[in-house]
Each structure stands twice: as structure tokens, then as C-alpha cells.
Amino acid sequence: MPQIKINGVEHTIDADPQMPLLWAIRDIVGLTGTKFGCGVGACGACTVHMDGQAVRSCLTTLADAQGHVIVTIEGLSADGSHPVQLAWQANNVPQCGYCQAGQIMQAAALIKQTPKPSDQQIVDAMSGNICRCGTYQRIRQAIKSAAEWVG
């Protein structure tokens, strides 16, 4: 049985090691902030951090995740005080909100790796995260705001 550390807690997952991490996070561990969007890694709704890197949990198997540190939107900040979350609020990014967890996780990984991202780096990093409401301009502004606050 795969053992995976999610948000600082060790979990023994009684499931097929080929199960997508997304379903273990949502259905077994009970953390529903990570969303299912497409199931093929194209939309970004299921983005989590694995050892600090943004990954698509719908494509990452339990076997792939074993031995790695997984952080979901719930683990990014217990009280919503991560700079990206605060910037999201300050820039009025959310509309329907479905993509927000994945967008925030992708943006947080970007800022951790590239504390002062250029406009093109933001566009490139966020290109795999789809927002059906079209708030891309506000998303980019929020990332710039968060980067300023962090740096």
C-alpha cells in the first residue's frame, strides 16, 4: 500500500498504486479543494505540489507520489494567508472559483521558483491552467502582486 505525505500528514492509501493521486486526495483522504477538470492534465484544476513542484494530480499515480511530499490547496496555508491567496483576493480574481485551487497552486510554485517572474514567465507557467470565466488578466496581476509582496 502506498504511503504518501499529504499536507504534513502520512497516509497509508489502501488502493491500487496506479490510481491517480487526485482520487486518493479527494475520495480517500477527504480533501476536496483539489478539483477534477479534464482527467488528462490539460486544464490544471487538479494542480498540487509534489516536493514543491506543480504537478497534475490526475496524471500522477500513487506509485509516482510515494516517498514525496504532497501539498494541496488546503495545505498551502491553513488560514488563507499565503501571498498568492491574498493577492487573489486583493485583485478580485475569482468568479465561479472552480479553477482557483489549481491556478493558485501553479502560481505559488512559479513564485517559489522564480521570485520575480517576467510577464512572459507568468504566461508560460500558467498556460496549462484554464479559466472558463476568462480572468487571465486578473490572474496575471495577482501573480505580479504576490511576487512583489514576497520579494
What are these regions (language model features)?
Residues 1-151:
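Signature of N-terminal electron-transfer/Fe-S-associated modules in redox systems
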